Amino acid sequence: MAVGTLEHYESDGIIILPVFPNWAMLGAMLALKGPAALPWISNAFKATGVMVKIQDELAGEIYPDNYLYTSSKNPSDQDKKRLAKGAGIVRQVLKRAGASEDSIMELKPSGAHPSSCCRIGEVVNIDLETRVENLFCCDASVMPESLGLPVVWTAVSLGKRLSKHLDSQIN
């Protein structure tokens, strides 16, 4: 996911990246589409993947459930507009590259990298510590708003910063 179209659609809250799910995930995604997707399974090895990632609106809930926490976030109207615009751009590019309309399959949006549920300044302080002493949170959930970008480098940077802070507390 290193190459994308950030500079072209960032102001719209959209990036387009070359991504392909692993075969197990693809099989599950196709199965969720129902019987109409069965012909695609045999030709999946010929497919390529393009992901539309958006900067979604902050919404959703986290539910405590005994030992697990589940979450729910339905796309807002603005989220749906951004996804539709991005999918339209991808469809147009694929057609210009020679793909026929019936060779393009659009999968349902899937959530990944939930963010902004433990925002810095609200749930954690600038050192990523919660109100519970020595309990830290260090992932995309501390971001003040949805990044709309892959979060790996940001999360790694936060982890390095936190490790330096914790090291300074010990030494």
Tell me what each language-model feature is.
Residues M1-G88, V124, R131, P144:
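FAD cofactor-binding and catalytic pocket of flavoenzymes
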Residues M1-Y9, D139, K164-Q169:
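Glycine-rich loop(s) and the adjacent beta-strand/alpha-helix scaffold that form part
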Residues N43, L149-P150:
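Composition- and surface-driven signal marking solvent-exposed, interaction-prone regions
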Residues E57-Y63, A97-E101, D167-N171:
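Short helix-capping/linker segments at secondary-structure and domain boundaries
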Residues K81-S146, V152-V156:
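A glycine-rich dinucleotide-binding beta-alpha-beta segment and adjacent secondary-structure elements
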Residues W153-Q169:
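An active-site-proximal "capping" alpha-helix that borders the catalytic cofactor pocket
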